[in-house]
């Protein structure tokens, strides 16, 4: 029996407030913006929020990063902006909570598998052992999975549907060999192609490889990372129309329900936000993330939740701009 609320690991301290609007990426502010959006849409009651988790100390980051980088970042040294974001002490403090949030969500999914565990965070999957990259400071998913493997002996798979390849796990394997046990080779999955073929790539991996690995005991938990920048109108992504983006969500959450039945118990599942930029309309990013959770509530938890997706067409200058925008709006103003 599944718990009917999404367990959410959110502490306001994981949000960058000061100077947040000067950054190109709004990821440091996204947790707060999403919580506010969910409340505005009357959906926040479906989320059980806890801030009862400890911030990470420097030693936690050393699981996947060099001492030099960790020390340099928290002191505001030369590599403190290698992530492409502005640095200040409050931002440095906030990443202690974002990384602790994803770890806490994954660990909770294992200890309380009836709860869908949610970390409203991003800014992890491009970081490398000796520096940040691509708006990512520390490789939180690599740190979390190594800690979970060391503490609980559990092995995970990441379904990374961000608009960009999640390199941090692969780039950390040589630096931290325990990661090869925590997330085996081939289980940091990033779909290829676009639209229907992108969707099919996800389905083939999940049904053809991941499912058998779970049933055989090779994989213990799954982390779902459905980045909004894999949407076609994100300026830093391109893979999926609204239809195929939401089809991925619908497939995943219905598959989790199917796996619960095959296992005879809840499959440990956690999720995080990952990318999404839309400098012209950030509500479109928040709406995509919300639609993903609506599919979770409907497909997995069997709740009758009403929500109409609000993805606006990106204004593009060139051939057929006006006609494309109008037809795109008709196609994508849909209830999910």
Residue locations for each model-derived region?
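Short, flexible active-site-adjacent loop segments at beta-strand->alpha-helix junctions, enriched
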Residues: 12-14, 67, 123-124
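N-terminal low-complexity, Ser/Thr- and acidic-residue-enriched intrinsically disordered segments
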Residues: 1-56
């Amino acid at each position: 029996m599944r718990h009917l609320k999404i367990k959410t690991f959110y502490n306001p301290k994981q949000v960058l407030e000061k100077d947040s609007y000067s950054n190109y990426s709004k990821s440091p502010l996204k947790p707060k913006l999403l919580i506010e959006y969910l409340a505005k849409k009357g959906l926040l009651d479906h989320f059980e929020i806890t801030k009862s988790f400890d911030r990470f100390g420097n030693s936690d980051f050393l699981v996947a990063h060099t001492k030099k980088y960790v020390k340099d970042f928290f002191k505001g040294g030369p590599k403190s902006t290698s992530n492409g974001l502005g640095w200040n002490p409050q931002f440095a403090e906030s990443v202690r909570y974002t990384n602790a949030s994803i770890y806490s969500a994954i660990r909770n999914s294992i200890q309380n598998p009836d709860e869908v565990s949610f970390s409203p965070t991003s800014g992890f999957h491009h970081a490398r052992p000796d520096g940040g990259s691509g708006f990512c400071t520390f490789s939180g998913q690599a740190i979390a999975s190594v800690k979970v493997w060391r503490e609980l002996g559990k092995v995970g798979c990441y379904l990374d549907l961000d608009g960009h390849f999640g390199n941090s796990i692969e780039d950390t394997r040589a630096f931290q060999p325990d990661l090869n046990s925590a997330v085996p080779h081939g289980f940091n999955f990033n779909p290829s192609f676009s639209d229907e073929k992108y969707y099919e790539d996800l389905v083939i991996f999940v049904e053809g490889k991941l499912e058998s690995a779970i049933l055989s005991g090779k994989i213990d938990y799954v982390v779902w990372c459905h980045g909004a920048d894999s949407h076609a109108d994100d300026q830093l992504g391109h893979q999926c129309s609204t239809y195929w983006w939401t089809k991925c969500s619908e497939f995943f959450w219905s598959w989790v329900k199917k796996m619960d039945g095959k296992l005879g118990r809840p499959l440990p599942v956690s999720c995080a936000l990952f990318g999404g930029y839309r400098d012209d309309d950030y509500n479109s990013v928040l709406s995509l993330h919300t639609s993903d959770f609506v599919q979770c509530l409907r497909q997995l938890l069997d709740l009758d939740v009403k929500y109409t997706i609000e993805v606006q067409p990106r204004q593009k200058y060139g051939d057929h701009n006006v006609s494309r925008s109008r037809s795109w709006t008709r196609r994508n103003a849909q209830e999910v």
